[in-house]
């Protein structure tokens, strides 16, 4: 399945501040699809929460995106939308920004993943 995904050229998308987006764009993440839609959104102080929400909804509907990276401070603004996304792909990863460090206690995706595994089961299976 991973090989098929790689052959299709699945993308990573980014919703973040300018520094975050520029960093990923310099790393080669930036793409514009055949419909001329980019796989990134630069959020600034003038960006409405509804714009972030709409962008996230567009990204989860695109079949060429497998991973959505979003600055955690913006994820907090649209938490209800992120929490309603339960499909395995695209995977949503919350990342820190230059001005806002990552806080694992706010990451609902991480909390959901932790709930899937019982640490005691892992220890019992190692024997």
UniProtKB/Swiss-Prot annotation:
PANTHER family: V-TYPE PROTON ATPASE SUBUNIT F (PTHR13861:SF2), VACUOLAR ATP SYNTHASE SUBUNIT F (PTHR13861). GO terms for molecular function: proton-transporting ATPase activity, rotational mechanism. V-ATPase is a heteromultimeric enzyme made up of two complexes: the ATP-hydrolytic V1 complex and the proton translocation V0 complex. The V1 complex consists of three catalytic AB heterodimers that form a heterohexamer, three peripheral stalks each consisting of EG heterodimers, one central rotor including subunits D and F, and the regulatory subunits C and H. The proton translocation complex V0 consists of the proton transport subunit a, a ring of proteolipid subunits c9c'', rotary subunit d, subunits e and f, and the accessory subunits VhaAC45 and ATP6AP2. It comes from Anopheles gambiae. The gene is Vha14. Keywords: Hydrogen ion transport, Ion transport, Transport. This is V-type proton ATPase subunit F. NCBIfam families: V_ATP_synt_F. GO terms for cellular component: membrane; proton-transporting V-type ATPase, V1 domain. Belongs to the V-ATPase F subunit family. It comes from the Eukaryota.
């Amino acid at each position: 399945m991973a090989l098929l995904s790689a052959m299709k050229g699945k993308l990573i998308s980014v919703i973040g501040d300018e520094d975050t987006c520029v960093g990923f764009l310099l790393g080669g993440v930036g793409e514009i699809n055949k419909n001329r839609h980019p796989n990134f959104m630069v959020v600034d102080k003038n960006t409405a929460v509804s714009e972030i929400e709409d962008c996230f909804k567009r990204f989860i509907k695109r079949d060429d995106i497998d991973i959505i990276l979003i600055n955690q401070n913006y994820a907090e603004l649209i938490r209800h939308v992120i929490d309603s996304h339960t499909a395995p792909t695209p995977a949503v990863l919350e990342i820190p920004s230059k001005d806002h460090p990552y806080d694992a206690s706010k990451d609902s995706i991480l909390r959901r993943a932790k709930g899937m595994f019982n640490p005691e089961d892992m220890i019992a299976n190692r024997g």
